[in-house]
Design a protein with these regions (language model features):
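A generic local secondary-structure boundary/capping motif
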Residues: 25-28, 64-65, 87-90
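Cys/His-clustered metal-coordination modules, chiefly Zn-binding fingers
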Residues: 72-97
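Auxiliary alpha/beta "docking" domains used to position bulky ligands
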Residues: 50
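Generic structural motif
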Residues: 18, 42-44, 59, 79-83
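A general structural-boundary detector
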Residues: 11, 53, 89-92
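Helix-adjacent hinge/juxtasegments
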Residues: 53-79
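General detector of N-terminal leader/presequence modules that precede the first folded domain
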Residues: 1-47
Length: 97
């Protein structure tokens, strides 16, 4: 198993259904960032069997509507100084613009 170090600063997008991580990666334009971004696919998960996970080593605004449409079960964790300071559980958006 590959180990990816713990984030000191940034965002973790977790509980992504296996196979949906790359779509989220593309829709959020993470390939255009100059910061470190890690997409892990098919990670073992006791809850989900397998899941995808994205770690972003920077703070940025995320479009929760896009995330909620692609995978409404995603959780977003904000990390500061190595500690999770906020965790958001998404749900599908009410309307799409």
């Amino acid at each position: 198993m590959i180990n990816v170090s713990k984030l000191k600063e940034g965002i973790v997008i977790d509980h992504i259904r296996a196979g949906h991580g790359y779509k989220i990666f593309q829709q959020l334009g993470l390939d255009k960032l100059d910061d470190v971004v890690v997409l892990m696919r098919n990670v073992d998960s006791t809850k989900m069997g397998h899941k995808d996970l994205i770690k972003i080593e920077t703070h940025l605004e995320l479009n929760f509507d896009v995330l909620g449409l692609i995978d409404p079960d995603v959780t977003i964790s904000y990390i500061r100084e190595g500690v999770r300071v906020n965790k958001i559980k998404l749900s599908p958006p009410e309307t799409v613009k």
